[in-house]
Design a protein with these regions (language model features):
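Nucleic-acid endo/exonuclease domains
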Residues: 1-93
Length: 93
């Protein structure tokens, strides 16, 4: 089976690599929606750079639920999670 190339960045092919069925906790849906609306400055700046496939035609999800967690950004086609630490992480135990 030939691997599908998602995009090419500076002549380097980026191949698809994703998990078909990630765990999902529907009770976190409202929290994820609230986090999307209230994003911290770093997340908002990052989102402005990558939304609408503007970064090498790669589709990013924001505040994606994976299991019992909400990750800042997720690229399904790559199986890639991006967490941007903000002030809130200083107060969690």
């Amino acid at each position: 089976m030939q691997e599908e190339i998602l995009t090419t960045i500076h002549n380097i092919p980026i191949k698809r690599n994703f998990i078909l069925n990630l765990p999902y906790n529907p009770s976190l849906k409202d929290r994820a929606k609230a986090l999307r609306k209230a994003g911290n400055f770093s997340e908002v700046v990052f989102w402005k750079e990558v939304r609408n496939k503007s970064f090498w035609n790669i589709d990013f999800d924001r505040q994606r639920i994976i299991g019992n967690y909400i990750v800042d950004f997720y690229v399904k086609a790559l199986g890639l999670v991006i967490e941007i630490d903000g002030e809130i992480h200083n107060f969690q135990e």
